[in-house]
A protein has these predicted regions:
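Short intrinsically disordered coil segments
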Residues: 6, 75-84, 243-250
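Active-site/acyl-donor-binding loops of N-acyltransferases
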Residues: 43-71, 198-276
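A short, structural micro-pattern
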Residues: 8, 32, 54-58, 88, ...
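Aromatic (often tryptophan-rich) hydrophobic motifs at membrane interfaces
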Residues: 1, 9, 17, 23-28, ...
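A gly/proline- and charged-residue-enriched helix-loop-helix capping module
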Residues: 3-47
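A conserved beta-strand-loop-helix scaffold within acyl/acetyltransferase catalytic domains
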Residues: 1, 41-178, 191-192
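A general structural signal for short secondary-structure junctions and capping/turn motifs
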Residues: 28-31, 52-54, 86, 219
């Protein structure tokens, strides 16, 4: 038996305020399933619970959205301001996409990063089509695309919930990184958050030792925290885990650099559902 809540989320704290609320909630979950894994950023009760062990940690960054563009511009690191200005002067432009247009261009970048940089399969294209239909077309997010000349060289997919904007997906065209698209993209994300009345831009999870990405986020973020990965002590291996190595091997084969991109995409269509 598996209980999955908000799969692929960077973190998902239980909706409890203290240990007196956490204990009955967690006990019921443990009764239903012997395997329970959590990612907590705010809640301390699960972290202090002796029934769980900490199996990992990650960094979290956020940007408090200031009232004016000038205030926001002055707060970001000087190196970030220089990078944004340099990219703009070199001809990098950023456009906003609030419908299905441009989603395929972003997906092609995303597929290439997953495949050639990390050796991983990408989510199915229909996953991004669904995000577009359910978020972008309802003004609950935006796709930012960076262009140099006629080529799309970077993109960021942002999703909104209430007064928060989430930096959910980022992808870049590797040969285009010399034009520094990620800095104008980040600045455009901050501007979009301010213009749409958001109070926070959530930059999400970063692996603890991913120093390059940490430095990049710190140029813009004024908030930093820790995400704790927790797992029930002594939890037995679930039966579905037995297929894990096979799925992993298939993923590596289908995401190999010599495999046509169309085959890699189809591999994601077939296998990604098993990764939740």
């Amino acid at each position: 038996r598996r209980i999955v809540s908000m799969p692929f989320s960077d973190y998902c704290d239980p909706l409890v305020e203290d240990d007196s609320q956490w204990q009955p909630v967690s006990s019921e979950f443990l009764r239903l399933s012997p395997v329970l894994k959590l990612r907590c950023r705010r809640s301390t009760a699960p972290v202090d619970d002796e029934r769980f062990e900490k199996t990992g940690r990650a960094r979290w960054h956020g940007v408090t959205i200031l009232p004016t563009g000038e205030e926001a511009w002055q707060r970001v690191d000087g190196s970030a301001r220089r990078a944004v200005t340099k990219a703009q002067r070199a001809g990098v432009t950023v456009t906003r996409v609030c419908d299905g247009q441009g989603v395929r261009a972003f997906y092609d970048l995303h597929l290439a990063v997953r495949k050639y940089k990390y050796g991983l399969l990408a989510q199915p294209f229909r996953f991004f089509e669904s995000i577009s239909a359910n978020f972008l077309t309802r003004n609950q997010g935006v796709l930012l695309l960076a262009h140099f000349g006629e080529r799309t060289i970077g993109g960021v997919l942002l999703l909104r919930w209430k007064d928060r904007l989430y930096y959910k997906f980022n992808a870049s065209y590797a040969p285009g990184l010399e034009h520094r698209p990620n800095d104008p993209l980040m600045w455009s994300a901050i501007e979009y958050a301010r213009e749409t009345g958001c109070e926070l831009l959530d930059l999400g999870l970063t692996d603890w030792d991913q120093e390059g990405l940490i430095r990049y986020k710190r140029k813009y973020a004024d908030l930093e925290g820790e995400i704790s990965f927790l797992e029930r002590k002594g939890a037995p291996q679930a039966h579905h885990v037995a297929a894990g190595p096979l799925i992993g091997e298939l993923s590596q084969l289908l995401a190999g650099p010599t495999v046509p991109d169309s085959v890699t995409e189809e591999g994601g269509n077939l296998l990604y559902r098993y990764f939740a």
